[in-house]
Amino acid sequence: MVDNLEPLPASLQNLVEQDSLKWIFVGGKGGVGKTTCSSSLAVQLAKVRESVLIISTDPAHNISDAFDQKFTKVPTKVNGFDNLFAMEIDPNAGLNELPEEYFEGENEALRVSKGVMQEMINALPGIDEAMSYAEVMKLVKGMNFSVVVFDTAPTGHTLRLIAFPQVVEKGLGKLLRLKMKVAPLLTQFASMLGMADVNVDTLSQKLDDMLRVITQVNEQFKNPDQTTFVCVCIAEFFSLYETERLIQELTKCGIDVHNIIVNQLLFLNNSHSACKMCASRYKIQEKYLDQIADLYEDFHVTKLPLLEKEVRGPDSIKAFSENLMTPYDPKAKPKE
C-alpha cells in the first residue's frame, strides 16, 4: 500500500509557503554546499516574507564569499535586496568578543557590572559562550525578523548549536539561583576595585530577561510549526551516513526535519556520450539516490545539479535558488 503513495514534491516550496516558520536550520556534512543552499533558501524566502535574516554559525563564514560581501556580527543588509539581512557569529565566542552594538542603551553601571560578572562567569565552564549565544538570540529576537535561516557548521557543531538553548536555560537558571549569594560578593568585589556604581539588581534583571528570551526560543525550536531543519547531502556513502545520523539526532532532540537536499548531482544528456568518469560517477549517484528514495519516502527530496561554475554573488544565488522551487531540468536554458 505504501508503494502506491505519490512521492512528496521535490522542492522546498513547502517551507517557503509555511508562514508560521520562524527558524530554519540548514546543515550537513562539510563540503556538500550548505552555504549555497541556505543562501538560496533565504533569497526565496525574501520574496514572500517581510524580513529575512541568514546567520552563519560556521567559523569559516562562507556567506560573505557566497554573496561577495563582507558581513559582521551585526545584521547587515545584503546588496541587491531590501529585506534580506546577513550576519556571521561564532557560537564559541565569549561575551567580551561581542561588538558594542549588543549593549547599546545600557547605562555605564550595567556595563561595569557586566565586566565584573564576566570574571565570575569564567569560573563556570561553558556559561560564557552560552551567555554570548543568549545575547545574540536576544538581539535577533528583538529585531523581529519574519524568519531566520541558520547556515550551520558541519554536523557535530550543528547538534551542539541546536542543544544550546537548553544549555543556556540551565546555565542562566544556575546563575539566578546563586543571585542571593553572588550579590554581596559582587558588591564587595566592585567596592575593592573602586566601582561604586555597580547595580546588582539591574544586572539580575538583565539575566531574567535573557532567560525569558532563551526559554521562548527553546520552546519554539521544538515546535514544528515554527522550526524545521533542512539536511544537505551529496549522493555518496559517507554523506548519506552522516545525514541519517543527523536526522536521528534531530529526532531525539525533538527538532522537525522533513526536507533533504541532494546537491552536486550529474544530469547526463542522452544526446551526448558521457566520459568514462562521468558515467561512473552517475551510476554511483543513481545507486545512492535509490537508497535515499527508499529511506526517506516521507521527506521532500530536492535534487540540485553540479554546475560548471561556482555560485557566487547575489545574481548567481538568485538564479540558482529557482532550483529549490522547481525541479531542475537539464534541458532548460539557464537564465541570464
From Swiss-Prot:
UniProt keyword ATP-binding present: yes
GO cellular component, one term: GET complex
Protein name per the record: ATPase ASNA1 homolog
Residues holding ATP: K29, G30, G31, V32, G33, K34, T35, T36, E236, N263
Domain of life per record: Eukaryota
Entry-linked CDD domains: ArsA
A Gene Ontology molecular function term of the record: ATP hydrolysis activity
InterPro entries assigned: Anion-transp_ATPase-like_dom, ATPase_ArsA/GET3, ATPase_ArsA/GET3_euk, P-loop_NTPase
Organism from which the protein derives: Drosophila pseudoobscura pseudoobscura
Major subcellular site: cytoplasm
GO biological process: tail-anchored membrane protein insertion into ER membrane
EC number: 3.6.-.-
Subunit structure comment from the entry: Homodimer.
Listed Pfam families: ArsA_ATPase (PF02374)
Reported function: ATPase required for the post-translational delivery of tail-anchored (TA) proteins to the endoplasmic reticulum. Recognizes and selectively binds the transmembrane domain of TA proteins in the cytosol. This complex then targets to the endoplasmic reticulum by membrane-bound receptors, where the tail-anchored protein is released for insertion. This process is regulated by ATP binding and hydrolysis. ATP binding drives the homodimer towards the closed dimer state, facilitating recognition of newly synthesized TA membrane proteins. ATP hydrolysis is required for insertion.
Family, similarity comment: Belongs to the arsA ATPase family.
Active site: D58
Keywords annotated in UniProt: ATP-binding, Cytoplasm, Endoplasmic reticulum, Hydrolase, Metal-binding, Nucleotide-binding, Transport, Zinc
Residues the record lists as binding Zn(2+): C275, C278
Cellular localization per UniProt: Cytoplasm; Endoplasmic reticulum
